[in-house]
Amino acid sequence: FPSFAASPLETHFAADPNQKMDAWYGEQIAKYTTDPAFNTQLTRSLPASDTVPTPAKAMGDVSGAPNMLPRLKTIHDYFRSLAASSPRVKVFSIGTSEEGREMIAAAIADEALLADLENNRQRLAQLADPRLIGLDDSRAQELITQSVPVYYITGAIHSTETGNPSSLMELA
């Protein structure tokens, strides 16, 4: 199959020349990737931050590194450290598992949306069920203009799916 790295899409993902990059992080990902075709500009140009931690700071290496499987506490601590270091991350406790382990969700957005999450949720609920707005198209358009779509990405549903939590740490 053709490599994404060699595709025309690659040019659309150029790094911001003003953004400091984490060269070590990109090198580690390249080292652990089984085929260079899987690496793209996105994995070669990872932004660096003096305040927001990377998964490597939580685990000692990049997500997906050989022989590295993060424990639940490490994963939760990482997401909470993101929330503590960035106004664009908020962590919620959403209950406990059958075995009594805490389950969390992380919302990642701009500060304004995080401050307005509940109102945004209510607007989206109205759009999801047009009966709530009396099937009023003009009200629907107003809600669309005021609302921000939410993308829900989940992982770690099954204990044998060990890569998902690491992937979510990386994605965050």
PLM regions and their residue ranges:
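Hydrophobic h-region of N-terminal signal peptides that target proteins for export
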Residues: 1-5
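Structured catalytic-domain cores with a bias toward divalent-metal coordination
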Residues: 6-172
